[in-house]
Curated annotation (Swiss-Prot):
Belongs to the IspF family. One of its GO terms (biological process) is isopentenyl diphosphate biosynthetic process, methylerythritol 4-phosphate pathway. InterPro entries: MECDP_synthase, MECDP_synthase_CS, MECDP_synthase_sf. Signal peptide: none annotated. 4-CDP-2-C-methyl-D-erythritol 2-phosphate binds at residues 12-14, 38-39, 60-62, 133-136, 143. It catalyses: 4-CDP-2-C-methyl-D-erythritol 2-phosphate = 2-C-methyl-D-erythritol 2,4-cyclic diphosphate + CMP. This is 2-C-methyl-D-erythritol 2,4-cyclodiphosphate synthase. Pathway: Isoprenoid biosynthesis; isopentenyl diphosphate biosynthesis via DXP pathway; isopentenyl diphosphate from 1-deoxy-D-xylulose 5-phosphate: step 4/6. Binds 1 divalent metal cation per subunit. Involved in the biosynthesis of isopentenyl diphosphate (IPP) and dimethylallyl diphosphate (DMAPP), two major building blocks of isoprenoid compounds. Catalyzes the conversion of 4-diphosphocytidyl-2-C-methyl-D-erythritol 2-phosphate (CDP-ME2P) to 2-C-methyl-D-erythritol 2,4-cyclodiphosphate (ME-CPP) with a corresponding release of cytidine 5-monophosphate (CMP).
Length: 158
């Protein structure tokens, strides 16, 4: 009998850093400030990476892309996701599907949702759904100080 599918959960949060490029769901949003971070600050992709790693029992992005390691400084979320997928394949897993929800007031994801889903699906080699919500003025994201994202991923052993 083959191993049952495995589910992983990922979460990330970053504050905005004025003047920094805004990368979110793998896309550049040029009219918005980006998020602070060692890499590109893309909370959605980081949450996806954590969800995929968690599902396959491979730790988290903090362990894989250590902040003190200069190889990962300013690395793109797309490159991180590619690296995670390759790691998964080496360990005998593949992603079945994933979902990510961005939490924040800006930038608006809706107008670029299809573009984001296509990009993330290509990177993960599996269907990815993208959603967004706000916290109705509550907390860091509600005050417009940053963004967070939560993601799930389903993987199977191949």
């Amino acid at each position: 009998m083959s191993e049952l599918p495995r589910v992983g959960l990922g979460f990330d949060v970053h504050v905005f850093e004025p003047g920094r490029p805004c990368w979110l769901v793998g896309l550049l949003f040029p009219d918005n400030d980006g998020c602070a971070g060692h890499s590109d600050g893309d909370v959605a992709v980081h949450a996806l990476c954590d969800a995929v790693l968690s599902a396959a029992g491979q730790g988290d992005i903090g362990g894989l892309f250590a902040v003190g390691d200069p190889r990962w400084e300013r690395v793109s979320g797309a490159d991180m996701l590619r690296h995670v997928v390759e790691l998964l394949l080496r360990h005998g897993y593949e992603v079945v599907n994933a979902s990510v929800q961005v939490i924040g007031n800006r930038p608006k994801i809706g107008p670029r949702r299809t573009e984001a889903q296509r990009l993330l699906s290509a990177l993960l080699r599996a269907p990815v759904s993208v959603a967004a919500t706000t916290t109705e003025g509550l907390g860091l994201t509600g005050r417009g100080e940053g963004l967070s994202a939560i993601a799930t991923a389903l993987v199977v052993q191949v």
